[in-house]
Amino acid sequence: DDIVVTIHTDNSVSVVDNGRGIPTGVKMDDKHEPKRSAAEIALTELHAGGKFNQNSYKVSGGLHGVGVSCVNGLSKWLRLTIRREGKVHFQEFKQGIPQERELAMRDGFAISPMKVIAVTEKRGTEVHFLPDGEIFSNIDFHYEILSKRLRELSFLNNGVRIRLRDERQNKEDNFAYSGGVKGFVEFINTGKKTLHQKIFYATGEKNSDQGSSIACEVAMQWNDGYSENVLCFTNNIPQRDGGSHLTGLRAAMTRVINKYIDDNEMAKKA
């Protein structure tokens, strides 16, 4: 429930959390020679982290397991530190290639476990990377863009605290908002004249035709402005152009409002 994102003076970025830590055990069913740790596989192979499991995919973004492996492949270097089960595991990559492998034998197979560099009572994962300047023409991180996105994530993941630090400018922001999407609407309407004090909020869950469960949250509050501000997210990922969920909401609201107008003969009064 605590995440720290730091932009360092060399324009590298580190992300530290206090979660369970990426699994570090060697995957004996790995086809690679030597057999690698689960963490190395997740950071070097596309689709290795795919979340084809309803519980895993309920909240988190991504699906096909390409995110962190792409970051690794597009970085000049990436350093992975995992604190798990009382040990500090470490592995370094350069342009996606593991460096200074640990090698051992197990059950007649060559294995490459993560290096253990210390003991600890803490837990969590730290990813520290520097974008590759030979691939990107601009590797400067914009504080405002990161700040806006991390604020969104703080609202969308109620109870999670996210801290953003910029060592280049000695700036820091703490995002620890409560209230979820309802609190997000309240934040967006700050300083605006709202037409109703209470924020409309609804949540529900329904099984799809494929048998998976889909949960939905909606929060709305009208203000006296002339333009609308509609934000849509699926598993924390913003949909700039909306989607079928927004289309369905608009259709349902139009139907309900028209019915209310007809039932109360408001159109005739107008």
Specify the residue positions occupied by each region the protein language model found.
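GHKL-type ATPase core
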Residues: 2, 9-38, 49-187
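Glycine/charge-rich, flexible interdomain linkers and switch-proximal surface loops
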Residues: 6-8, 59-65, 201-203, 265-270
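Short basic (Lys/Arg) and small-residue
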Residues: 42
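Mobile ATP-lid/nucleotide-binding loop of the nucleotide-binding subdomain
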Residues: 45-46
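GHKL/Histidine-kinase-like ATPase module
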Residues: 108-116, 144, 151-153, 159, ...
